[in-house]
Amino acid sequence: MPEADIKPRSRDVTDGLEKAAARGMLRAVGMVDEDFAKAQIGVASSWNEITPCNLSLDRLAKSVKEGVFAAGGYPLEFGTISVSDGISMGHEGMHFSLVSREVIADSVETVMQAERLDGSVLLAGCDKSLPGMLMAAARLDLASVFLYAGSILPGVAKLSDGSEREVTIIDAFEAVGACSRGLMSRADVDAIERAICPGEGACGGMYTANTMASAAEALGMSLPGSAAPPATDRRRDGFARQSGQAVIELLRQGITARDIMTREAFENAIAVVMAFGGSTNAVLHLLAIAHEANVELTLDDFSRIGSKVPHLADVKPFGRHVMSHVDHIGGVPVVMKTLLDAGLLHGDCLTVTGRTVAENLEAIAPPDPDGKVLRALINPIHATGGITILRGSLAPEGAVVKTAGLDTDVFEGTARVFDGERAALDALEDGTITHGDVVVIRYEGPKGGPGMREMLAITGAIKGAGLGKDVLLLTDGRFSGGTTGFCVGHIAPEAVDAGPIAFVRDGDRIRLDVAGRTLDVLTDPPEFAARQQNFTPPAPRYKTGVLAKYVKLVGSAAIGAVCG
């Protein structure tokens, strides 16, 4: 088979008399005559100093470039943004989190297209930067490799009773709720705050970043075994160099992102997310990435796969372990091999190694599940996957609940309705949210929020207040990957689009049936329908800027909250 053209695009800026000015610019950044015959590789990084999630990317980008050079290419690094959900949580800043996913994808596309780069290595560490980079790869359909920054190690807090406790960032959110109810001292909150982030890396549990890193590996877009090692682990530098080499080999073989991101590959990613009991945000992001790859993927696919794939991983937020423990027992390949052997994974999917999933796993030969961090298929934590898709009179287009960790299937209670998260937090702090309540937080969807904010402040506070198993929370917004408890998000249609959630009133009875996959408001249908007459949505919160544009473009959470 003849080798593909390794400069399918960069000839536009390097070849011919009329490109003298472009070559002159490239000489100024270090290129010499012989470099103009090399493939030009964009090394896109979301490195910044705002959050620990991305701190390793500066180091890793250097190793990626070494790998590109070693393989005969020429790397050109550029940056994009990243928003820290941990810092932006619980205030106005969270409106800007999900839109950052689109900004990242758009900015990478813009640079890659404008500069005619031949391929890319995409580096990310924060929750929205991972899917944003993968969306860009799918949209561009060039030779691309994704590289994760790696997760943070757990911290150890020394509490006032003399005990020591392993903690992650989620413990801080829950400590706030406990302290506000008098269940924890301010000194212990301070001890937890100081311990939760002992260094660089993304939040350590199976929260959104680690879930999406695992999904990227299962999707075939990152090197096998690269998702689990911590950010500080020097194996990451090796994966970075190999990623730089891999993108050149993909160019030589003529393999592009959509050759890898097939429907079967997305089914593999969903299966791994289900086995891990990963973040509900993976539903939103995988739908969006599939949209960019021109792959038809729906909420029904998550239901279908989740009904077959058991929940195997005892990981936070519901379990005991973090990503570094997953790494200790062999990483994501252990999960993938377990699923492959059971016929729950497509082994013939192509990956960035140029080989198939099955071939990669045969070469790695991962160990069997250890039985603690990851259980065997014959002894799952739950018989079905850790995420369930719901439908019903309150969510005709769908809703999402994380079932990993739930110990009951049915919750029926009385609605307490709040237009926005802040009002719900105030009610919790006042002690007026009690056992049996169904807390409904609306006008927090993609358009209505805008930005579909994560509700970690309220869910963490509810758990910290000791109500995690006694209160059901519903929203057209999202939840953090660190959320625990009875929490249903992504309710669609959202309130601003006249979805049923807009017409729920205090005192309505609401029923969640996880096994039946239903979410219903039990109000008499004619009465409920009468409430919908003459509906007028609230005026847009933002009249100018990025969110004003976002509201005009963004679609339903049921299709990934994509813009166009």
Swiss-Prot record:
Keywords: 2Fe-2S, Amino-acid biosynthesis, Branched-chain amino acid biosynthesis, Iron, Iron-sulfur, Lyase, Magnesium, Metal-binding
UniProt-annotated catalytic positions: 480
N6-carboxylysine sites (modified residues): 128
Reactions listed under catalytic activity: (2R)-2,3-dihydroxy-3-methylbutanoate = 3-methyl-2-oxobutanoate + H2O; (2R,3R)-2,3-dihydroxy-3-methylpentanoate = (S)-3-methyl-2-oxopentanoate + H2O
Alphabetical list of SUPFAM superfamilies matching this protein: IlvD/EDD N-terminal domain-like, LeuD/IlvD-like
EC numbers: 4.2.1.9
Residues at which [2Fe-2S] cluster binds: 53, 126, 203
Cofactor requirement: [2Fe-2S] cluster; Mg(2+)
InterPro entries xrefs: DHAD_IlvD/Edd, Dihydro-acid_dehy_C, DihydroxyA_deHydtase, DiOHA_6PGluconate_deHydtase_CS, ILV_EDD_C, ILV_EDD_N, IlvD/EDD_N
Taxonomy, superkingdom: Bacteria
Family statement drawn from the similarity comment of this UniProt entry: Belongs to the IlvD/Edd family.
Protein name (Swiss-Prot/TrEMBL): Dihydroxy-acid dehydratase
